[in-house]
Amino acid sequence: MKALLKYSLVVLMLLVSSFICAQKGMGDDGNLSGRKKKKVKVGLVLCGGGAKGVAHIGVIRKLEEVGIRPDVIVGTSIGSLVGGLYAMGYDSKQLDTIVSNADWNYLLSNSVQRSDVSFSKKLSEEKYFISIPFGADFKELRGRKEEESAGSILKNFPSGFCNGNNVLNLLNGLAVGYQDSISFDKLPIPFACIATDLSTGDEVVLDHGYLPLCMRASMSIPGFFNPVKIDGKVLVDGGVVNNFPVDIARKKGADIVIGVDVQSDLIAPDELESLDAVLLQLISLMGNDKFLENKKDANIYIKPDVSKFGTMSFNKEACDTLLVNGYKAADEKNDVLVALKKLLGEQNGADDTVLKARNIQESTFHVTNILFEGIDPEDEKWLMNLSGLKRNNIISGKEINQAISLFNGTDAFSQVTFLLSEDKGNNGAYILKFFFKPAPSNVISIGARYDTEEAAAMLLHLGIKENTLHGGRGAINFRLGFNPNANFSYGYVFRNFPRLDVNYYFKKTDVNIYSDKDSRNNIKFIYNGLEAAFANLKYFRTFDARLGVRLDNYKFLRFLTEKEKEVNTKAKSYLSVFTEAQMDNRDDQSFPTNGIQTKVRAAYYMLGFHGGFKAFASIYGNISGVWSPAEKFAVIPQLYTRINIKNKYEFPYYNYVGGSEEGRYVDHQIPFVGINYTSVFDNSLLVLRTDFRYNFAKKHYAYIIANYLRSGHEVGNMLSFKHSGLWGFGLQYSYRTKIGPLSFNIHWSDYNKKKVGAYLSLGYFF
């Protein structure tokens, strides 16, 4: 090893010395009068490798310690991200902070922060594990052959799993000062990145244009990220053709090339068992010959240990280890790097007089004007009101990012980016410009779940014109399973008027209902409902209010009771008016760490289309909050109540309590740990519950649950301590999965003291 190191030092010294001697200046006339030494250019080449590219930062840290500043940087994929930021002026410490603070699950997805999603989207989307937008124009498809229509629809599906919008806006926010179209030679360190032309398979060297977009193009992994269009070319990850672009660094004038290789070895045959492994292998094979050629041409070859990490290993522990491994690998070349620094002398690769990029998160700007491009002029005012931004005002970078997140939260746009450019008429001021790309307006979504009460179920959703700011939209939902249901809805969103919703509901239900501790009724019924309501006046993210009218129809197919009791099973219809309000500012639906969720609903049933009906009313309410006294511990208090007003009310509107899920068999069913299925209770009902949750591992949660129930014929009876209430307790384990929580609990209550129950579920509830 020592012999190899000495050999490397000798070769490096001879290379640099011979280069310097060869460049001793001659005058223009060929004489020796103009003796000058040409500056030796050092190139830094950073290859692709996904999360493994964090090791590049460790190498840069070592170069900074030695004092080597490259004259040119060339990167591919993640190497373009790290290299581009370094070229803009971010040092290794800042790069480490950026990587450590980044929410990679968010960046590598199409997600919008829950706080920025509209309330209606919260209600609808947190049921599905996959949603696929598409933009087929159904008018255009009308009249075509069936196979042509299907093909036209498929062409409008997205070209990648992730649109890359979140990554692009991260880069945009870090490139303030270099967001406009420029030559990358004007950066503090000249820079270039590599992409692949998807139409020809050719290598594309990106050394001018919109820097963040070029960096994003270079890391467009085929199938994962949507391709990027630049100058009429459809570009994907440069690693397909040139993952270690030493040759490009040479063309950019580099005399000495430091190459950092974080590419994994080719995958063994017995490990090619998954789709991602096959895709990565294909990409590696396509550019392998050029990779081997460039590897030989690197003067200083640095190979960090990335053997234990994958393309998506962006968790904090992995990033910390990769950074250390990068530093260690560079430190093993310490003698060579020190020798190179001595030969270079005081020459500095970076031009310290060139302005460094600003991080938008740490800056404020005097913005004289805000412009919008790519939207209907009539929507501009609406979006301005939504963002809360004001022209001729001091605006922070966080406010700009918040506005982008709000725009994305409408789901009307597949891409929202921004540009901060200097206002030439006002010294030190900026013009903020937002760019919008419309999203596919339609969506197909799929949800799936299993639980021990109803077995397996699937939810299918088709939204037509769903991802639009205003106008009409429709949706069709089918729940397939033991208790199937369907929902057909149409809504019209006005710009300056409450939203109008019209819904038709169908539901077939087979359920065991307990009328007391020992008596069970088996009921099977068909429900049809028609509802029209006005909803929020404007775009609300945490609040929703509705006012409407509803027609319910119940047809009982079976009503088996263990006690002799007359039950009228004829079809019955009820007309009601209702109002409801909901609020939800929790940071997560399934495992929140802060926030409050509440719902209040009042209904007046004024008509029953059968004899003996008397008008009655009902009031329902629930509230839950999350308090986190420690990092992994949460206390979740909850309250549920429902009161039927008037002594005589109808069977479908009794108070039903039981099970782990709210609203399973009837909309107003209240959950209670310790009672399986559902049971009937008196007119006035109150349930208090507290969950104690501990996050003992990354996605693993343990619960202790206690709930208490009181009921009475009237509110006074319910609150009276002349009779005792019911207690229920449970222990639960939950695991966060991509299709929803996996949960198992065991429970007991004094409603039925003889039995300990159990419940298993997987997936979001619907």
Model-derived regions: residue spans:
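Short loop/turn motifs that connect adjacent beta-strands in outer-membrane beta-barrel proteins
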Residues: 467-473, 495-499, 539-544, 587-596, ...
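Buried hydrophobic packing residues in well-ordered domains
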Residues: 49, 79, 95, 201, ...
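C-terminal hydrophobic structural anchor segments
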Residues: 693-727
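C-terminal outer-membrane beta-barrel translocator/porin domains of Gram-negative envelope proteins
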Residues: 443-446, 578-582, 586-697
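Gram-negative/organellar outer-membrane beta-barrel architecture
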Residues: 398, 415-431, 435-586, 657-671, ...
